[in-house]
């Protein structure tokens, strides 16, 4: 099975960016790592320079690496764990963008 990732695009609520970053790093992402099938995570923030002048819809991206042959089951575990997670009203949860992606081409580096 190809390597699989879940991408979560999100924004902090206005005036809550420091709390948002602290909550993600110290609470939410460690909770996600406890879910069977979630192997690793990385967080990204938009760089100050973009490819064009188009306004980006989300400032932050989380990439969760999934280590499972049953992706739907892992996603079900994530949703099932949600009620017990220590959620905090610091993110615009109503406008999250979620996607599941799989590797098509392994990393190729210039030599």
Give the residues covered by each predicted segment.
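Macromolecular interaction modules
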Residues: 1-111
């Amino acid at each position: 099975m190809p390597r699989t990732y879940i991408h979560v695009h999100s924004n902090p609520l206005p005036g809550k960016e420091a709390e948002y970053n602290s909550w993600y790093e110290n609470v939410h992402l460690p909770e996600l790592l406890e879910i069977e099938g979630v192997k690793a995570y990385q967080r990204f923030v938009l760089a100050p320079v973009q490819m064009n002048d188009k306004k980006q819809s989300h400032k932050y991206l989380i990439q969760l690496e999934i280590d499972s042959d049953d992706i739907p089951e892992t996603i079900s575990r994530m949703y099932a764990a949600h009620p017990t997670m220590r959620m905090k009203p610091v993110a615009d949860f109503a406008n999250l963008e979620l996607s599941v992606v799989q590797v098509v081409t392994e990393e190729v580096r210039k030599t």
